[in-house]
Amino acid sequence: MESRATAKFMRVSPRKTRLVARNIDGLPVEDAMNLLRFTPNKPAGVLYDVLRSALANAQQMPGVDVDAMVVKQVVVNEGPSWKRFLPRAQGRATRIKKRTSHITVILAEGQE
């Protein structure tokens, strides 16, 4: 059985989030949660919340062994960017793109 959770429009850069997501792909859920809990950056906290949500979704399914769940796949897609301007010298302005992410975590029952 598979369980999934999605968080959309999260205010974290997709590029930085993918760096953290690669670390938990294929790990048992308990190990992935420990890794994310002690990773000191913002994407780790967001991924931790999505992973907890996927685990809670798995607990709602009958006949699923939550202790044997493994992170099957983590997908981080780019969401819309917020466009902002930063004032610069001599009346100029520079564009800033505040990027957002769509994060999907898929859990599956597997071998540890």
UniProtKB/Swiss-Prot annotation:
Belongs to the universal ribosomal protein uL22 family. Keywords: Ribonucleoprotein, Ribosomal protein, RNA-binding, rRNA-binding. GO terms for molecular function: rRNA binding; structural constituent of ribosome. This is Large ribosomal subunit protein uL22. It comes from the Bacteria. One of its GO terms (biological process) is translation. GO terms for cellular component: cytosolic large ribosomal subunit. This protein binds specifically to 23S rRNA; its binding is stimulated by other ribosomal proteins, e.g. L4, L17, and L20. It is important during the early stages of 50S assembly. It makes multiple contacts with different domains of the 23S rRNA in the assembled 50S subunit and ribosome. Part of the 50S ribosomal subunit. It comes from Nitratidesulfovibrio vulgaris (strain ATCC 29579 / DSM 644 / CCUG 34227 / NCIMB 8303 / VKM B-1760 / Hildenborough) (Desulfovibrio vulgaris). The keyword rRNA-binding applies.
